Amino acid sequence: MKLSVGSYDNSTTVDNEAEILADFQQRSQQAYQCGENIMTFCYGESPRERIDWFISAARKMGTIIFIHGGYWQSCNKEDFAFITAGPLARGFDVMLVEYTLAPQTTLTEIHRQIGAALDAIGRQPGLCSPVYLSGHSAGGHLAACWQAHPVADAV
């Protein structure tokens, strides 16, 4: 592990970060290629305010909302589509939420965007309950911030 005291770039602390992300992207590309029931919708006006909804062909067990990580500064929802395979096979729909990254916007605005995304998800016809809010790294932080949102049954 590389140490970078005072750095706000977590990628500098992982020796093989590029290889890990490349693996995520390759497996995620397969998820999009194999996915028959994927719907994308916007929840705001900025180009990154969008959600990919992977709809399970199996019985409806609920919905998992996933907010991607990347230290609020990198990655996108498409990098994490590989996480959909297990939940889809078990009957869960999965929604991948995108948001504008820092420094193009502030953490306050990112937080607001996630709230707007959850509001938009709550208005979607066919939303299957219960709804589980989740995320990785920065996305986990954002999920925790919004755990009391009315659309979320659990985090």
Features from the language model and the residues they span:
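Catalytic nucleophile-loop/oxyanion-hole region of alpha/beta-hydrolase
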Residues: 75-84, 95-130
